[in-house]
């Protein structure tokens, strides 16, 4: 018999302790991983509802199970809000992740062995953009473009040259570690020149796009995907969008998600997506995203003032790469040193990195999470100075301890969930 007062703390104290420790870590550590954020209590509430009990294979009005009349409403809300948010005429809210959304696009538009052109992982792309360790590089003929070593920006001339030479069936625009603004229109021009689909993965900038402070790829791309966390600050999940008004492609995309790549959708997560999309339609969300960019720019500028090398010389979005080659510090060691001071980052390869991806020569730094907990430009600059203090001599444990104390004070002033 199930009772409403059942809880994890009494039944599984070992698991409960781990959950409590992670909750404490999030409150007492400053989060600078660009792909992480804090979702609202409303999003968390949706994921903990009885919707998790319901199997709903298929799509609203076309389910393979009975009893779906209420979850149909949930999914339709998520779909309509996603369309409104991004100016789309098609939305599939069922992908469990961004990678699964991307896999569905490949399955819908390509045949195995077809040529795709995407950004190299080493230059800021994503695993699913053609990396040899991913399905995108194993099942398809992947050609990779990069950035201009001098400017740190995408080399559109190289993209066009590679497209003309290799005649890809699909060109991928998007990134996981790129601080510039992508010219979606230029990518579409190149795609049209060689008769390719343009597929945009805007996972990292979807929140900025929704707020209208980063160019919307929807008018240019055949298909757009995103995660629903990161800058969107929703639950972990994926989303596929389009505005080309091609019902044949829409059907192929739906079939590629279900039954092509997934079975039953996670209705409790789809409910959380619906909540997050509604939150993103609120004017306050635009204010938040504007501050995200202000904070990222302030941090990049401060690192440069302290003598550190920022790839491309700054940022125009929510993230930037810190190149530590000239400091003779590995990304792995920098990550660990900052972690000891309760500052969470992730090691990241920089362009033409001489070190392995398991060590790296850089850090990827993002501002969505710190902005979500209330940090402004002043706090962002102060935080950057603390980080530089640690990185100036990562062996100085006294500095790490001092910074840790300052971090704890700042976190107490700006709780994640106040």
Curated annotation (Swiss-Prot):
Q: Which Pfam families match?
A: SHMT
Biological process annotations from GO: glycine biosynthetic process from serine; tetrahydrofolate interconversion
Q: What CDD domains does its record include?
A: SHMT
List N6-(pyridoxal phosphate)lysine occurrences by residue. 230
Instruction: Identify the residues that bind (6S)-5,6,7,8-tetrahydrofolate.
Output: 121, 125-127, 356-358
Q: In which pathway does it act?
A: One-carbon metabolism; tetrahydrofolate interconversion; Amino-acid biosynthesis; glycine biosynthesis; glycine from L-serine: step 1/1
Q: Name the EC number(s).
A: 2.1.2.1
> Which keywords does this Swiss-Prot/TrEMBL entry list?
Amino-acid biosynthesis, Cytoplasm, One-carbon metabolism, Pyridoxal phosphate, Transferase
Q: Which reaction does it catalyse?
A: (6R)-5,10-methylene-5,6,7,8-tetrahydrofolate + glycine + H2O = (6S)-5,6,7,8-tetrahydrofolate + L-serine
Keyword rRNA-binding belongs to the record? no
Protein purpose:
Catalyzes the reversible interconversion of serine and glycine with tetrahydrofolate (THF) serving as the one-carbon carrier. This reaction serves as the major source of one-carbon groups required for the biosynthesis of purines, thymidylate, methionine, and other important biomolecules. Also exhibits THF-independent aldolase activity toward beta-hydroxyamino acids, producing glycine and aldehydes, via a retro-aldol mechanism.
Outline the subunit composition. Answer: Homodimer.
Q: Which family does it belong to?
A: Belongs to the SHMT family.
What NCBIfam families is this protein classified in?
PRK00011.1
- This protein's name: Serine hydroxymethyltransferase
Name the gene behind this protein. Answer: glyA
């Amino acid at each position: 018999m199930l009772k409403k007062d059942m809880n994890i703390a009494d039944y599984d104290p070992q698991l409960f302790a781990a959950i409590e420790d992670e909750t404490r870590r999030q409150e007492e550590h400053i989060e600078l991983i660009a792909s992480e954020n804090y979702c609202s209590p409303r999003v968390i509430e949706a994921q903990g509802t009885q919707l998790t009990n319901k199997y709903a294979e298929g799509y609203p009005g076309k389910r393979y199970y009975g009893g779906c009349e209420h979850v149909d409403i949930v999914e339709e809300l998520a779909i309509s809000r996603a369309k409104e948010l991004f100016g789309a005429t098609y939305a599939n809210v069922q992908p469990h992740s961004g990678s699964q959304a991307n896999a569905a696009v490949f399955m819908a538009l390509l045949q195995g062995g077809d040529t795709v052109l995407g950004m190299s992982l080493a230059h800021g792309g994503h695993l699913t953009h053609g990396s040899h360790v991913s399905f995108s590089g194993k099942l398809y003929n992947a050609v990779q473009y990069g950035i201009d070593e001098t400017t740190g920006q995408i080399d559109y001339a190289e993209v066009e040259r590679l497209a003309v030479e290799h005649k890809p069936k699909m060109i991928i625009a998007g990134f996981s570690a790129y601080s510039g603004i992508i010219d979606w229109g230029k990518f579409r021009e190149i795609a049209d020149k060689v008769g390719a689909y343009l597929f945009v993965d805007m996972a990292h900038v979807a929140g900025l796009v929704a707020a209208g402070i980063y160019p919307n790829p929807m008018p240019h791309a055949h298909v757009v995907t995103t995660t629903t966390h990161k800058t969107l600050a929703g639950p972990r999940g994926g989303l596929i969008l389009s505005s080309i008004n091609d019902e044949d492609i829409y059907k192929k995309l739906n079939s590629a998600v279900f039954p092509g790549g997934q079975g039953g959708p996670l209705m409790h997560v789809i409910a959380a997506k619906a909540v997050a999309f509604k939150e993103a339609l609120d004017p306050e969300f635009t204010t938040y995203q504007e501050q995200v960019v202000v904070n990222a720019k302030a941090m990049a500028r401060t690192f440069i003032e302290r003598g550190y090398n920022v790839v491309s010389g700054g940022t125009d979005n929510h993230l930037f790469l810190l190149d530590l080659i000239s400091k003779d510090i590995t990304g792995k060691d920098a990550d660990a040193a900052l972690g000891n001071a309760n500052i969470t980052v992730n090691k990241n390869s920089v362009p033409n990195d001489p070190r392995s991806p398991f060590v790296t020569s850089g850090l990827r730094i993002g501002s969505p999470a710190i902005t979500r907990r209330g940090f402004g430009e002043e706090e962002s600059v102060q935080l950057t100075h603390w980080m530089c203090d640690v990185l100036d001599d990562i062996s100085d444990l006294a500095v790490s301890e001092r910074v840790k104390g300052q971090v704890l004070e700042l976190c107490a002033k700006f709780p994640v969930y106040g």
